[in-house]
Amino acid sequence: RVGIFGIMQSFQVMQKLGLNIDEVDRITGPLVGRPKSATFRTLDVVGLDTLAQVAQGLYQTGTSDEARDLFQLPDFVNQMVEKNWIGDKAKQGFYKKTKDEKGKTEILTLNLETMDYEPKKKAKFPSLDMLKPVEDLRKRIKMLAKAEDKAGEFFRQTSYGLFQYVSNRIPEISDELYRIDDAMRAGFGWELGPFEIWDILGARETAQRMTEAGYEPAKWVMDMLEAGRESFYTVVQGRRQYYDIESKTYKSIPGAENFIILDDLRQSNEVWKNSGSTILDLGDGILCIEFRTKMNSMGGEVIQGMNKAIELAEKDYRGLVVGNNGANFSAGANLGLVYMYALDQDYDELNMMIKTFQNTMMRMRYSAIPVVAAPHGLTLGGGCELCLHVDHVQ
């Protein structure tokens, strides 16, 4: 229900701002923590026939839903369903794969004004170009929310509308707000749920901006803020808690004690950091070294961090974990740095870099405390070599 609302609202705001399919898919893709398929490519995979049936069902049954009218299909979707342009299962939907005169595969995009297919064009927005080099998703979201171009306006309007809608669905579809975030992450592949995004933008500040823009958060949100509760989630002793609207207090998320979320530990359990790595206290006498570089590649800062982690662990702790909560464990050595040294024919620096890495691996292998690696995703080159040297891989 929340996901379909988000899609239908995107249709509405897209038409209001005069955006096209390529532009919306760039705004609603990986830059904001959504799947690469974004909005329209996802619909092609799912099928517009499925979208039509679900939206129709929500419209018919949601007689008390304040956003009921939004679930009525726009004309372009009705036309596409009538023509059987329902997505991948029909070989065409919002996108269509074809071949040009030379036999080369070409992706065409549907022009929703003419209902004709046109060559796919790269969407260009100054704000999105600024976001691209920013690694931290939370920073990207904050930057886009303040952007003054159409991408920023689209993000604000769709976010404010979504925040209003999900706040009104508590406790109708869920007693606990964290379950809505869980559902959007698991069902739609979002990295962050609506309430998590709201927290990033600032619960109080965003509620005020929503009101100014004509969106009204649910009463329980305003009551929460009036009581001095400034966020939907909080971290207590390294464990995340959610705001419970019935008791008006923060409660622990059931099962959260079985997982270690490094982001939740960073505020209170940070022991040491540099620009490429962070050392955190996991409790029970265990340290964790977390890589913080692009794709967690290994450069000088990461090597320094690993040596510092071993030094600290051998002195005051019982063990060390090498792990992170990123998409990949490590893409290996920082090849950009290697390439730069090779291009400059600075072989002394290159040799020193290799030697330092190898010495660090041997230090991991023969350290006085147990070292455990927790690989996932890409574990390439130096990342793999690290796993081969530690005492245990989990």
Features from the language model and the residues they span:
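N-terminal glycine-rich phosphate-binding loop for ADP-containing cofactors
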Residues: 1-327, 336-356, 362-369, 376-379, ...
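Extended, composition-driven regions rather than compact fold-specific motifs
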Residues: 331-333
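Short, well-ordered beta-strand core segments
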Residues: 371, 393-394
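Conserved divalent-metal-coordinating catalytic cores
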Residues: 385
